[in-house]
């Protein structure tokens, strides 16, 4: 039996068996709760999307893990902009009203993020950088005025899989929730597709979410005692200030 291990994820350990099956194991109870949410969401969502998403062949509650067939593809770079936009349109149009999903008070949740970043990340910046960091944290108050929709919340290259030049699959739905659809545009508008024609206000909020991304990485590195996450997170944070 061939076995590959991916131990890089924050919430899950992933094993790939015989290049055919994915075994996904949560690292802690909050991650197990996210996995249960995925198990309730993905079967309802799959028919509404133009791409593959994981279809759990087996889901265990104790011990918690899931098994699904590997979705083949390479991380998205600059491929298939029309296909990516079609996926986003379908995702954000999906009616998730009957599904048990996190529905946070968005502004309050981001205020809590900002408070945590102010306590543990801001002090790591150089004195001359802190005023810009604080100004960014205060921008959290502007993350309002949108229609909440189902969001993936972690759309980066490694979760957007391409085959033959087309977006073929989207994985890792652990963060899915009802929230600001601009979050799903954060990396896409600021890396592969900056020339997309989108609403100015959506672009503004997407830029904020993109700039906040490395703050989460630094906080995670501090919380889990992983200095490399802190180092790389601070490097990316500084580049986005």
Language model: regions and residue ranges:
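Hydrophobic packing residues in well-ordered alpha-helices of helical domains and bundles
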Residues: 35, 81-84, 133, 211, ...
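ATP/Mg2+ or Mg2+-diphosphate-binding catalytic cores
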Residues: 32, 119-124, 128, 200, ...
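ATP-binding pocket architecture of kinase catalytic cores
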Residues: 2-106, 122, 145
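An alpha-helical support segment within catalytic cores of ATP-dependent transferases
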Residues: 1, 72, 80, 93-153, ...
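A cross-family signal for key residues in well-ordered alpha-helices
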Residues: 43, 189, 219
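Active-site Asp-x-Gly
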Residues: 30-32, 146-151, 156-208, 212
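FAD-dependent flavoprotein oxygenase/oxidase catalytic domain
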Residues: 10, 48-53, 72, 95, ...
